């Protein structure tokens, strides 16, 4: 792997300001999903190492929360600058371990850095309240304080941004945090904490442990010193973690599964809708929680949309992420390929037609053809399962009422998208869609200033925006006799 700064490729975990191996000496292999090439190893840590990281976070808490918001912001600002200074190396590292095209990886690094910059400033704006007292001899105040020791479990699909979106608000609020990155993509996390150390974040304030997810997760959810857990991943795992946190009444933030609908109304700009559909479906090979699962297209424009959409999808270039011109990289694992294949087989067995793709790519390995299916009917698994692959399912509809009902017919409620030029319809539909985020005439909705999160079984809490820091704060009421 060609990096300008080779020290960014760390093959040890980071606990209490020290780079360390697992107590057992065991390691996990990290492979390039595009080629299968071995990239390196990281420690296979477990319960004992997780406890040490949590204890270090507890020991570092008093000093870190005792610093002014401005002091913490200065360090976070330096971390932000270092992320941008090393963006090319960080992007190359991400592409090799995660598989996404290099231009997408670079975009993610900049996106990740934006959360650090944003929350460095938001930490200075954690305002309290003065409450008009019902008694002349009392003064009533509200202050906000960091919740304490936090833990975070992050996914492989956005291995940098999902870390900074959790770590930056925690540190800005005066909390300390321990992160467990996905075993598929630990090198991005370790590079981030390397730069955080260079920025001056003190020992114990931000640690990264790699290895046995159940063993580490059990300490993250069960250790009495941990006051908050943040998790991005599947709904079943989120449900499990939430249950484990209940024993010690921890605060939880959960960004879980999605089943995003994309609605094209009869008055939509079809070219714009196709462009938005490509972004919302095929970014990261369809492996994002806000990727579209279900395309609902009005009957009057269905053929026109489908034809143009297939033309554009056919032109997408599939290949290794570090190959120039690549638009779709590999899926993360053989298991992911098998899941996509299974969903397509289920749909075609039940009457769906393949307009494009539908099988493993000629490149072999974990590459899969960009796929478009039509004749989708109720009962097909891909209408209810999160696909997490480059498969688009097209469904006809005729009325607004019908499509709103179809769009909401899921346990999930993360993101939804629709295209319409009727302003009254825009407000009417947006308000009735049961989702935490709605993209209107756009397929790209996420940024650092907007609240990211879902409803129903897509999670709890919001990340990013002015609301993102609130999940790391406790409200304290002060009553002063005068």
Language model region names:
Residues 61, 65, 80-87, 91, ...:
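Structural signal for hydrophobic packing residues in well-ordered secondary-structure cores
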Residues 37-126, 137:
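Glycine-rich loop-to-alpha-helix module at the N-terminal edge of alpha/beta enzyme cores
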Residues 35-41, 226, 263, 317, ...:
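Conserved C-terminal structural/oligomerization subdomain of aldehyde/semialdehyde dehydrogenase
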Residues 36, 72, 94, 116, ...:
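Residue-level signal for inorganic ion chemistry
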Residues 38-45, 60-66, 152, 262-265, ...:
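Short, well-ordered beta-strand elements within core beta-sheets of diverse protein domains
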Residues 128-272, 397:
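Rossmann-like NAD(P) dinucleotide-binding subdomain of oxidoreductase/dehydrogenase enzymes
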Residues 1-34:
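Hydrophobic face of amphipathic alpha-helices that form TPR/SEL1-like repeat modules
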Residues 236-373, 377, 440:
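ALDH superfamily catalytic-core signature
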């Amino acid at each position: 792997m060609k990096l300008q700064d080779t020290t960014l490729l760390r093959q040890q975990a980071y606990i209490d300001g020290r780079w360390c191996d697992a107590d057992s000496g065991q390691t996990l292999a990290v492979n390039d999903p595009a080629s299968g090439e071995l990239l390196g190893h990281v420690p296979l840590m477990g319960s004992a190492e997780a406890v040490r990281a949590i204890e270090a976070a507890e020991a570092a808490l008093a000093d870190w929360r005792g610093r002014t918001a401005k002091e913490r912001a200065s360090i976070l600002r330096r971390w932000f600058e270092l992320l941008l200074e090393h963006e090319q190396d960080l992007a190359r590292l991400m592409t090799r371990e995660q598989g996404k095209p290099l231009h997408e990886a670079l975009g993610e690094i900049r996106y990740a850095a934006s959360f650090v910059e944003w929350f460095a400033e938001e930490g200075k704006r954690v305002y309290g309240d003065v409450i008009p007292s019902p008694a002349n001899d009392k003064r009533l105040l509200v202050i906000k304080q960091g919740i304490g020791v936090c833990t975070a479990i992050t996914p492989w699909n956005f291995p940098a941004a999902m870390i900074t979106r959790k770590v930056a608000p925690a540190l800005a609020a005066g909390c300390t945090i321990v992160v467990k990155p996905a075993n598929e993509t630990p090198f991005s996390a370790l590079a981030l904490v390397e730069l955080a150390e260079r920025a001056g974040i003190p020992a114990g304030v931000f640690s990264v442990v790699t290895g046995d997810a159940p063993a580490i997760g059990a300490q993250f959810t069960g250790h009495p010193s941990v006051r908050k857990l943040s998790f991005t991943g599947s709904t079943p795992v989120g449900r499990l973690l939430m249950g484990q946190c209940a024993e010690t009444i921890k605060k939880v933030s959960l960004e879980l599964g999605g089943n995003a609908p994309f609605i094209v109304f009869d008055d939509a700009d079809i070219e714009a809708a196709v462009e938005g559909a490509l972004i919302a479906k095929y970014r990261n090979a369809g492996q994002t929680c806000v990727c579209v699962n279900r395309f609902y297209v009005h009957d009057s424009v269905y053929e026109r949309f489908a034809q143009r959409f297939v033309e554009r999808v056919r032109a997408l270039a599939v290949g290794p992420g570090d190959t120039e011109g690549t638009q779709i990289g590999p899926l993360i694992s053989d298991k992911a390929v098998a899941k996509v294949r299974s969903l397509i087989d289920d749909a075609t067995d039940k009457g769906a037609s393949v307009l494009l793709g539908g099988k493993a790519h000629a490149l072999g390995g974990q590459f899969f053809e960009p796929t478009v299916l039509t004749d989708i009917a109720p009962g097909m698994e891909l209408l209810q399962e999160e696909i997490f692959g480059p498969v688009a399912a097209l469904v006809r509809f005729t009325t607004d009422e019908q499509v709103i009902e179809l769009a909401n017919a899921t346990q999930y409620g993360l993101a939804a998208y629709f295209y319409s030029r009727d302003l009254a319809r825009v407000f009417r539909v947006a308000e009735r869609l049961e989702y935490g985020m709605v993209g209107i005439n756009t397929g790209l909705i996420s940024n650092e200033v907007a609240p990211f999160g879902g409803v129903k079984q897509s999670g709890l809490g919001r990340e990013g925006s002015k609301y993102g820091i609130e999940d790391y704060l406790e409200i304290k009421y002060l009553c002063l006799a005068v």
